[in-house]
Amino acid sequence: MATFKLVISNPKNGIARQVEISGEEAEKLIGKRIGEEISAKELGLNLTEIFGEEIPADTKLKITGGTDKDGFPMRPDVHGPRRVKILVSRGPGFRPKEKGERRKKTVRGNTISPEIVQINMKLVF
């Protein structure tokens, strides 16, 4: 059974909250990709209770990224749930120290699998 830590951000005020889900709700996230949206009701989340302010019930959550069990970040441009070493010059998982620097880094693909531990999401009103 999968267990995920969801980091849900509210772009209106910049507040982020962490929630842990498991069981059937977590299984609904497996196979989803970065950029896809899912209803908060579908995951059994009460956003008003989590954020402590009134949030509409029909609010959706957009997947923005995540990390796997070993801390490797998910990248939207790597397809599938696999872990690969790619040559990167910018973006998630790499901060160049000098201009034009490229480096080979291990990253996770853009699809959620049971190996993912943390999923970053934002509210879409």
From Swiss-Prot:
InterPro entries: Ribosomal_eS6, Ribosomal_eS6_arc, Ribosomal_eS6_CS. Keywords: Ribonucleoprotein, Ribosomal protein. It comes from the Archaea. GO terms for biological process: translation. One of its GO terms (molecular function) is structural constituent of ribosome. One of its GO terms (cellular component) is ribonucleoprotein complex. Belongs to the eukaryotic ribosomal protein eS6 family. This is Small ribosomal subunit protein eS6. It comes from Thermococcus onnurineus (strain NA1).
